[in-house]
Design a protein with these regions (language model features):
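Alpha-helical linker/hinge and terminal dimerization helices associated
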Residues: 42-43, 64-86, 93
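A short LG(V/I)-centered, amphipathic sequence patch enriched
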Residues: 40-57
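Beta-alpha-beta core module
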Residues: 159-166, 171-172, 232-281
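Central regulatory/effector-binding core of bacterial HTH transcription factors
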Residues: 89-153
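Flexible hinge/capping segments at coil-to-helix
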Residues: 157-173, 177-199
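Hydrophobic hinge/microswitch elements
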Residues: 135-139, 145, 204-261
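Secondary-structure junction motif
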Residues: 102-108, 147, 151, 183, ...
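Short helix-boundary/capping micro-motifs
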Residues: 10-28
Length: 299
C-alpha cells in the first residue's frame, strides 16, 4: 500500500468516476484502475462497487476512506515538519451541535494557527451526522450532550462506532427566550408556564428520534412545535414569535445577540456536555489546542 494509492482512492470517491479522477490525477484510466485493484487485493476488501451505471463506495470502502484521509493528513504533517515547510496548508474539522462556545473556540484556533493557507471546517450539524463524521474520521472532534434519557441509546451507538465520550461540563437546563418575552422577568421558569408558547428545536433529518434531539426533554408533549435547521433562524423565531428552546444556558452575546437571554428551568435533570473522538485516532496538535480553547469558554 502506498500514499499514491490512497490519493487515488480518495480522488475517485470525491469525483465519482474513474474518468474524471484520472483526468484530475493526470494518469491513464487503466493505470488508475489497476492501482485500485492492487490495493483492494492487498487489503482483501472491496473499496468500490462497480456496476454498469458507474462506481459507488462499499461499506468497507467508506470506512477505509476515513482511515486513508487520516494517513494522508499525518503524512502531510510529517512533510511540513521535516521538509522545512512549516507554512503548509493545515487541515482540521470539528462537528458539533449548536453551541456558541464551540464557535468561539474555533475562532481562537484559527487566530492561533491560521497562516496564509489552511483548510478548517466547523460543521454545526445533526447529532447522528456528528457521530458519523467522527467515526469516518471526517472530523477529529464531535461535540454533543448525554443525559439520563439518551445515554443508553447514544452510548451504544458510540461504542459500535469505536468512539469515546469525554465529559467537558455538566449543565442544568435553561430556556433561551427573547428579552421581551412575557416570562423574561422571571428568575426561574416552569414547564407549565411555557405551555402556551411555541417550542423551537433543531431538526434531525431522517434520524428525528427523541434520542438524537439537541434539546433536553425532547419527549415532552407540546402544543406548538417548530423545527429549524440553523441557529439564526431559531433565534429570529424566538424573538418574533415569543418562542423558546431548552438549552445548556451557556450564551454568548456576540454570537447570539443581546435580545436573547437564558433563564433557569425548574427541573432536576442535567446535561453532560462533552466531545467524542475515535478510539483508533490520534489527537492532533490542532485538536489539543481546540480543546484547550473550549475549556477557556467553559471555565
Amino acid at each position: 500500500m502506498t500514499l499514491q494509492q490512497l490519493k487515488y482512492v480518495i480522488t475517485v470517491a470525491e469525483t465519482g468516476t474513474i474518468t474524471e479522477a484520472a483526468n484530475k490525477l493526470y494518469v491513464s484510466q487503466p493505470s488508475l484502475t489497476n492501482a485500485i485493484h492492487e490495493l483492494e487485493k492487498e487489503m482483501n476488501i472491496v473499496i468500490f462497487n462497480r456496476t454498469n451505471k458507474g462506481i459507488t463506495l462499499s461499506k468497507e470502502g467508506d470506512d477505509f476512506l476515513g482511515y486513508a484521509r487520516q494517513v494522508l493528513e499525518q503524512a502531510a504533517i510529517l512533510e511540513d515538519k521535516y521538509k522545512g515547510n512549516p507554512g503548509g496548508k493545515k487541515q482540521f474539522c470539528v462537528s458539533t451541535q449548536h453551541y456558541s462556545f464551540a464557535v468561539n473556540a474555533f475562532v481562537d484556533l484559527i487566530k492561533q494557527y491560521g497562516q496564509e493557507e489552511y483548510d478548517f471546517s466547523l460543521r454545526e450539524t445533526q447529532t447522528y451526522e456528528i457521530i458519523e463524521d467522527v467515526a469516518r474520521l471526517r472530523s477529529e472532534i464531535g461535540i454533543l450532550f448525554l443525559n439520563d434519557f439518551n445515554q443508553t441509546v447514544l452510548s451504544k451507538l458510540l461504542k459500535s462506532h469505536d468512539l469515546e465520550f469525554h465529559q467537558l461540563f455538566v449543565a442544568r437546563p435553561h430556556v433561551f427566550i427573547s428579552r421581551k418575552h412575557p416570562l423574561a422577568v422571571n428568575s426561574i421558569i416552569t414547564n407549565e408556564e411555557l405551555e402556551e408558547y411555541p417550542y423551537l428545536s433543531f431538526e434531525q433529518g431522517e434520524h428525528n428520534s427523541f434520542y438524537f434531539s439537541e434539546e433536553i426533554f425532547s419527549d415532552f408533549e407540546r402544543k406548538k412545535n417548530i423545527r429549524v435547521r440553523d441557529r439564526a433562524t431559531l433565534f429570529n423565531l424566538l424573538i418574533g414569535l415569543n418562542g423558546y428552546t431548552v438549552c445548556s444556558g451557556v450564551i454568548d452575546k456576540k454570537l447570539n445577540g443581546k435580545d436573547i437571554i437564558a433563564v433557569p428551568l425548574t427541573d432536576e435533570s442535567d446535561m453532560r456536555i462533552g466531545y467524542i473522538t475515535h478510539r483508533k485516532g490520534m489527537l492532533s496538535r490542532l485538536g489539543s489546542t481546540y480543546l484547550e480553547a473550549l475549556q477557556k469558554y467553559l471555565g
